[in-house]
Amino acid sequence: MKPLILVLNGPNLNMLGTREPAQYGHETLADLAQGCADTAHAHGLEIEFRQTNHEGELIDWIHAARGRCAGIVINPGAWTHTSVAIRDALVASELPVIEVHLSNVHKREPFRHLSFVSSIAVGVICGLGSHGYRMALSHFAELLQERAA
């Protein structure tokens, strides 16, 4: 059985391709999901790719990942800067987490510079567009190979 990585996307990411394309690009969420699926397949991983605009739903998905998934790639969107609950759920999952952002949050408004997730993540990738998700999945493949050796 292939290791399962949960790829989570927070609020407004369903609007990719039409929302602020200068900031987030022209790729849609479906394009992003397909790129992640292709990368996962190439590395012998499976993914569950999800997006929600409801914080409690995201937390439920994180809770359900414990003991079932090998890791979590998460773009919490605006919740990055506001949600202690998501941070606590990620800690409770006891899974390695990679935080991803399409835009370089450090080149944007000061309130976007704070992340409640970064301090508990094994890595943070921002500003590389959808390539950041693929990099995160590639890293998980390497991490899992190292653990298996």
UniProtKB/Swiss-Prot annotation:
* Xref: CDD domains: DHQase_II (cd00466)
- Keywords associated with the record: Amino-acid biosynthesis, Aromatic amino acid biosynthesis, Lyase
Recorded GO terms, molecular function?
3-dehydroquinate dehydratase activity
Q: In which pathway does it act?
A: Metabolic intermediate biosynthesis; chorismate biosynthesis; chorismate from D-erythrose 4-phosphate and phosphoenolpyruvate: step 3/7
Show the catalytic activity.
Answer: 3-dehydroquinate = 3-dehydroshikimate + H2O
**Which InterPro entries does the entry mention?**
DHquinase_II, DHquinase_II_CS, DHquinase_II_sf
Highest taxon, organism lineage: Bacteria
Q: What Enzyme Commission number(s) does the record list for this chain?
A: 4.2.1.10
GO terms of biological process kind? amino acid biosynthetic process; aromatic amino acid family biosynthetic process; chorismate biosynthetic process; quinate catabolic process
Positions of the record's site feature: Transition state stabilizer: R19
User: Which sites bind substrate?
Assistant: N75, H81, D88, L102, S103, R112
Residues forming the catalytic site: Y24, H101
**PROSITE patterns to which the protein is assigned, alphabetical:** DEHYDROQUINASE_II (PS01029)
Q: Does the keyword Amino-acid biosynthesis apply?
A: yes
The entry describes its oligomerization and partners as: Homododecamer.
User: NCBIfam families of this UniProt entry?
Assistant: aroQ, PRK05395.1-1, PRK05395.1-2, PRK05395.1-3, PRK05395.1-4
Please describe what this protein does.
Answer: Catalyzes a trans-dehydration via an enolate intermediate.
Write out the similarity annotation.
Belongs to the type-II 3-dehydroquinase family.
Q: What is this protein called?
A: 3-dehydroquinate dehydratase 2
